[in-house]
């Protein structure tokens, strides 16, 4: 019973469509009708600016962290935190409060890892920032960090680096989260191939792509 309640709570927590609600309540803008139409951090930054984007990022990360820590907070030591965190990501991606159309799972996945394996998250965040600096594309940075997450969760425990031992629940969760992130970035991958992906005005833009107009 406790497990079901925790799963439900995590899903509902993840379902809070941060960017969408910030847009509606503070800016009177429906994010679905602007930019990429996505309700996640990237589109919020692009359409509503730095303050709204930063708030969305932090709240979306916090949703994942809080959900992951729920079993600890209620004293359910027999329930795996990573499993509960996973349901927050599902909520974020398929939110009941926003017609089951949510974000691309990146920020909330980061939040889950922050609650479960913070040093490992720091490593993946470094991969993300480095890729972002080199190519100026948030989508490519998210995809690269996801692929590196899968490779590293399978190899790091063998080298006792950042992940001390194999944790099959963490491994499965990382693989599934990476798959969700990659699937949610199908349109971005097409645009990266066509060299028409949205760039941010930071970094080296190594692919020498011309800044695209907003899609």
Curated annotation (Swiss-Prot):
UniProt membrane topology term: Multi-pass membrane protein
A GO biological-process term: phospholipid biosynthetic process
Gene Ontology cellular-component annotations: plasma membrane
InterPro entries: G3P_acylTferase_PlsY
Cross-referenced Pfam families: G3P_acyltransf (PF02660)
Catalytic reaction(s) noted: an acyl phosphate + sn-glycerol 3-phosphate = a 1-acyl-sn-glycero-3-phosphate + phosphate
UniProt KW Lipid biosynthesis keyword: yes
MF-aspect GO terms: acyl-phosphate glycerol-3-phosphate acyltransferase activity
Keywords, in A-Z order: Cell membrane, Lipid biosynthesis, Lipid metabolism, Membrane, Phospholipid biosynthesis, Phospholipid metabolism, Transferase, Transmembrane, Transmembrane helix
Stretches that traverse the bilayer: 3-23, 42-61, 68-90, 110-130, 134-154, 162-182
This protein's record includes keyword Transmembrane: yes
EC number of this enzyme: 2.3.1.275
Record's subcellular location: Cell membrane
Record's subunit section: Probably interacts with PlsX.
Protein family per UniProt: Belongs to the PlsY family.
Function: Catalyzes the transfer of an acyl group from acyl-phosphate (acyl-PO(4)) to glycerol-3-phosphate (G3P) to form lysophosphatidic acid (LPA). This enzyme utilizes acyl-phosphate as fatty acyl donor, but not acyl-CoA or acyl-ACP.
Protein's name in the database: Glycerol-3-phosphate acyltransferase
Source organism per UniProt: Streptococcus equi subsp. equi (strain 4047)
Gene: plsY
